[in-house]
């Protein structure tokens, strides 16, 4: 079973850097740029972990 991480950050560059690092570490990721996208991703499937830029 692979851990799935939801990355939520409005800055695309930062979001993609974090995404690349996490994928390289062997985890699955999903991305969201804002609150609405994050809720849509959570509604699809609850992630194991969320990294949130506040």
Identify what each model region corresponds to.
Residues 9:
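Conserved acidic carboxylate
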Residues 12-30:
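Two-component/phosphorelay signaling modules centered on CheY-like receiver
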């Amino acid at each position: 079973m692979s851990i799935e991480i939801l990355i939520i950050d409005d800055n695309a560059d930062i979001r993609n850097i974090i995404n690349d690092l996490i994928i390289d570490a062997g985890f699955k990721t999903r991305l969201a740029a804002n609150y609405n996208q994050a809720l849509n991703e959570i509604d699809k499937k609850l992630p194991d972990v969320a990294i949130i830029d506040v």
